[in-house]
């Protein structure tokens, strides 16, 4: 089983990734993947897509047909278009309701697996030391702060370890991002210098 130190660290990595990528992006990606599965919802999505193409095609045919010169043909196309449009709107409402239900399920699962797990770990392991500090290395007031609120003195509490992990992950992400931007700007500048020299 994963140690408490690593469990808290990976929970904070997951929280950081969700916050960085964005919950909406993750929800959309999961919805697309869900529609690839053989479910009734994916069948409804395919049917909605087919109806949309049919409505667009009938609308195009209606626009290309003169309502005065070819009224019978235009009226027949209009009836088909209206029927297809009603079916499309009904299917769209059904699919929207299914997507709303799916989004709520994903949001609940995402919260439970990230912030919910973090809160659970904080309460469940509130009296458990994450790790012990070497004796005599820190003054007693520092040991008290590191064990705050309920861990034994001379150890690091779950709450403090949560803060350390969140801060360390954010700082490391900033460092990696700035390094990547520096590398990108350095690799782009020789190419632009070479182009400028060729132009002269």
From Swiss-Prot:
Question: Which parts of the chain does the record assign to the membrane side Lumenal?
Answer: 1-4, 132-155
The record's Gene Ontology cellular component field reads: endoplasmic reticulum membrane; GET complex
Q: Which Pfam families match?
A: CHD5
Tell me where it resides: Endoplasmic reticulum membrane
What sections of the sequence does the record tag as coiled-coil? 42-100
Q: Which InterPro entries match?
A: Get1, Get1_fungi, Helix_hairpin_bin_sf
Sample GO molecular function, one term: protein-membrane adaptor activity
Per UniProt, what is the membrane topology? Multi-pass membrane protein
| UniProt keyword Protein transport present | no
Task: State the UniProt keywords alphabetically.
Answer: Coiled coil, Endoplasmic reticulum, Membrane, Transmembrane, Transmembrane helix, Transport
Which parts of the chain does the record assign to the membrane side Cytoplasmic? 25-110, 173-200
Q: Where are the transmembrane segments?
A: 5-24, 111-131, 156-172
Where is this protein primarily located? endoplasmic reticulum
- Any one biological process term the GO annotation gives: tail-anchored membrane protein insertion into ER membrane
**Family recorded in the similarity comment:** Belongs to the WRB/GET1 family.
Q: HAMAP family annotated for this entry?
A: Get1 (MF_03113)
Function, as annotated: Required for the post-translational delivery of tail-anchored (TA) proteins to the endoplasmic reticulum. Acts as a membrane receptor for soluble get3, which recognizes and selectively binds the transmembrane domain of TA proteins in the cytosol.
Q: How does it assemble?
A: Interacts with get3.
What is the protein's given name?
Protein get1
What organism is listed for this UniProt entry? Answer: Neosartorya fischeri (strain ATCC 1020 / DSM 3700 / CBS 544.65 / FGSC A1164 / JCM 1740 / NRRL 181 / WB 181)
């Amino acid at each position: 089983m994963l140690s408490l130190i690593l469990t808290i660290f990976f929970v904070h990595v997951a929280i950081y990734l969700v916050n960085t990528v964005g919950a909406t992006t993750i929800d959309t990606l999961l919805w697309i993947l869900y529609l690839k599965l053989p479910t009734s919802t994916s069948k409804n999505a395919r049917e909605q897509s087919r109806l949309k193409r049919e409505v667009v095609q009938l609308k195009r045919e209606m626009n290309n047909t003169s309502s005065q010169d070819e009224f019978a043909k235009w009226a027949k196309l209009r009836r088909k278009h209206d029927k297809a449009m009603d079916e499309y709107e009904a299917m769209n409402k059904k699919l929207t309701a299914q997507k709303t239900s799916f989004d709520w399920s994903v949001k609940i699962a995402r919260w439970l697996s990230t912030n919910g797990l973090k809160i659970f770990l904080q309460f469940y392991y509130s009296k458990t030391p994450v790790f012990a500090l070497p004796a005599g290395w820190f003054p007693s007031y520092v040991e008290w702060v590191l064990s705050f609120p309920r861990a034994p003195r001379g150890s690091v509490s779950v709450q403090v370890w949560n803060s350390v992990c969140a801060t360390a992950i954010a700082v490391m992400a900033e460092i990696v991002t700035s390094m990547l931007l520096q590398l990108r700007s350095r690799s782009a500048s020789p190419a632009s210098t070479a182009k400028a020299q060729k132009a002269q």
